[in-house]
Amino acid sequence: MKPLPVISCCTPLAGAFLSDGEAAELERLFRVLGDRHRLKILNILLRAGGDAVCVCEFIDHLGLAQPTVSYHLKQLTDAGLLEREKRGTFAYFRVRPAAMERLHGLVEPVAG
């Protein structure tokens, strides 16, 4: 009598998987991005095409108080997503292209 073949119920997993460090980095970034105001700020900056945007423009566009906008900008800056530039008494922000590339590089394999 011939032995029966073993049939696997699962498709073997293939490809590169997130390391613990990459997963922790994504978790940190998603926590920062998990706020609608920060997502709106990031959207404004991405639409600015690399140009710096003054903090006062966020206040006008978002309808938030200056301290609240500053808090959200600090969260995004501390996460490494934005860079800050001081011009006189005003602060200007822009997206760090390297940070967006890194985020895309981490998310793309997960998204497929």
Language model: regions and residue ranges:
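N-terminal leader segment of winged-helix/HTH proteins
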Residues: 1-33, 79
